[in-house]
Amino acid sequence: MAAHRSWLLVSFFLLEVLLLEAAKILTISTLSASHYILMNRVSQILQGGGHDVIKLLYEGGDIPDFRKENSSYQVINWRLPEDQQKTFENRWHRLIDEYAYGRSKYHTLLKIHQYFADLCSHLLSRKDIMELLQKENFDLVLLDSMDLCSFLIVEKLGKRFVSFLPFQFSYMDFGLPNAPLSYAPVYGSGLTDQMDFWGRVKNILMFFHFTKKRRDIFSQYGNTVQEHFAEGSQPVLSDLLLKAELWFVNSDFALDFARPLFPNTVYVGGLLDKPVQPIPQDLEDFISQFGDSGFVLVALGSVVSMIQSKEIIKEMNSAFAHLPQGVLWTCKSSHWPKDVSLAPNVKIMDWLPQIDLLAHPSIRLFVTHGGMNSVMEAVHHGVPMVGIPFFGDQPENMVRVEAKNLGVSIQLQTLKAESFLLTMKEVIEDQRYKTAAMASKVIRQSHPLTPAQRLVGWIDHILQTGGAAHLKPYAFQQPWHEQYMLDVFLFLLGLTLGTLWLSVKVLVAVTRYLSISRKVKQA
């Protein structure tokens, strides 16, 4: 039965590919390494699905190891002039340091978006690139919703687009549909779907706070919009988000909390999954030294790697030294402090085959920054985690990891060797974490369609139907007072109060009449 179903799905997929003419699709990637990796994979999948893909790539991003790949699709590169490029890179590094060690992360976040807005102005000013994109006459654009500039690019091109949300779906994140605040935690609240009374109070207050924060973030692009769009036709960013034909979400219900979704929202978490390859022999030899104890994989992402201080590296190295497991750590040798001796059970490398190591039978723990791509890879292979979240969606991802008993989270700023060691030992030795990880692995791998098939299938559907108007609820066009039924509530409240007032008046009048009648009879 299962084999028959699989053949039907494959046949349906092949038929769709044969019937659909190749479309010209633009993908946009202007953010950091993890975003590049994901959009690179999306572009490869669409190209492999029979479409003609062109990617707009900002070369100034932190993606040195991946830019050298031979792409199956065409790439349009752009970068700032050399004098400005260095200035922008220094500004970016200062902002990341400020976010890590400064007091006000919120104000630093606004500065980061102002940085992206300034970068956006440079891109929109490049007439050669914008004219080239116009000339290509794309059938569809697929953009990263974290890159707000891409919405302005699409508006300039006047093309239909699909939005890719690279992290967790949260209430009113980026124009996506809402869900009841009683069980849908607001982004940044640190809450799960199981809230007590005070948790629900916090959640609704966070809703108003997040709404303001979202408005403040969008306002950073105000000058960019005024500079590049004629007065009278200047778009509102929040309105542009609602124009998306589809929303692809880089998550899976093996990790995320269950919630209602609109028909134009599709979960495709796990796009980076690929066939497991044997690991290099030097890594296999290192792992074999530790026998049944196995090994720990450590990978903290590109942003965290930028701000790892000497003290943090020293504390982590000290904790690893007391583990019976071997430790494979993605850490550039150029970042390693000269006065810190590498623990004998630790091997550092500039790059490690993360997916292949997560699939290795001897892995016992994954120490991660909590980025969505890394978390989804760990879920796919059933590996427990210790998370050190720092930036963006990472804390929210680790809230879900902890809620599902897939691991434990600790803070980068307060990381100490002793507590870090105890946390790692707890996750390795307590079987409930491994049991939960294996259960999530089954959920993750038992979908009837792979994430790639879902992605291509829904893109083809949009191309065949000429858009997704049939998937968008009328709520997208309603004013907020109608959407939240405030006008109906006020009408019913007024009707109820009016009826009560009238009833009281009638009762008073009747009582007075009866009282007067009684007095007349007595007289």
UniProtKB/Swiss-Prot annotation:
Tissue expression pattern: Highly expressed in kidney, while it is expressed at low levels in liver. Not detected in other tissues examined.
> Mainly localized where?
membrane
Per the UniProt annotation, where are the glycans attached? Answer: N70
The organism's superkingdom is given as Eukaryota
Which residue positions does the secretion signal occupy?
1-22
Q: Which of the seven top EC classes does this enzyme belong to?
A: transferase
Entry's family note? Belongs to the UDP-glycosyltransferase family.
From the Swiss-Prot or TrEMBL record, give the protein name: UDP-glucuronosyltransferase 3A1
Q: Which organism is it from?
A: Mus musculus
